[in-house]
A protein has these predicted regions:
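Domain-level signature for proteins that mediate thiol-based redox and metal-cofactor handling
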Residues: 1-37, 42-244
Length: 244
């Protein structure tokens, strides 16, 4: 599975895959796209490099050709990924460091957002914050969100077994205590809301930029509301002052 790391969603679901073909001799040709011409080059490089790794690992693929279209840094990114050069070499003189730290930051945010997705149903079902602080991952009802959280924690080397605490610090892996739990849950919620808002905005902008839905795109109704709000030119109603 190839993810748009900043949004923690598959690039297919986001609509970022413009086309994908595999020749009879095992050459996979994938064209990627982004919502704007000026999307951050570090994010774009991560996406293309991760796509190269994911496609190359598919059984039967002899060679992967991953191309980012319509981006101001397309040439540098495409040539760098094809040559297996890193970000610094691909942007010689412009980049100071590789993207490992950035990737880890994105995954930590995904852990926080995933924590909210797992904990909200538990709280809605009557669990208390004290309950959450004492729970393990294995005690959470099985769900796609739980396994997604487990996967992100594993990527960072954080505790992720059934016996691991449900709530851990996304940097240190230490269990979150009862006193720190309210703040931790607020941060998790804000991170999840921010990620979903960014995802909706990206989908809306991509839809405005390209007519086709993309290979494997999944429609998100939230993006419709966000896009309508951004494009709404109706002036806000004037404030009515009341006088005694």
């Amino acid at each position: 599975k190839n993810l748009g790391r900043e949004l923690d969603e598959p690039v297919t679901a986001l609509g970022f895959v413009a086309s994908c073909t595999v020749s009879e001799d095992g050459v996979a040709d994938v064209h990627l796209r982004l919502p704007t011409y000026f999307c951050a080059p570090n994010f774009a490089f991560l996406m293309v490099a991760d796509a190269y790794e994911a496609v190359s690992a598919v059984a039967g693929v002899r060679r992967a050709a991953i191309v980012l279209d319509d981006h101001f840094a397309s040439d540098a990114i495409n040539e760098g990924v094809a040559a297996r050069a890193g970000f610094v070499e691909s942007f010689d003189g412009l980049a100071a460091a590789e993207l490992d730290d950035l990737r880890a930051d994105f995954i930590r945010k995904a852990v926080l957002a995933g924590t909210d997705r797992v904990c909200r149903p538990l709280l809605a079902a009557g669990r208390t914050t004290d309950d959450l602080a004492a729970m393990t991952l294995g005690e959470v009802p099985a769900s796609g969100d739980r396994e997604r959280l487990r996967e992100r924690r594993a990527e960072l080397g954080l505790p992720c077994s059934d016996d691991s605490p449900l709530l851990v610090d996304a940097v240190t892996g230490a269990a979150i205590g009862v006193q720190a739990l309210p703040l931790h849950l607020r941060k998790a919620r804000l991170t999840r809301v921010g990620a979903e808002a960014n995802s909706g905005i990206c989908r809306g902008m991509l839809r405005d930029r390209y007519a086709g839905a993309g290979v494997g795109a999944v429609h998100d109704p939230n993006s419709d509301a966000l896009n309508d709000a951004m494009n709404d030119s109706t002036p806000a109603p004037a404030r009515v002052e009341e006088h005694a």
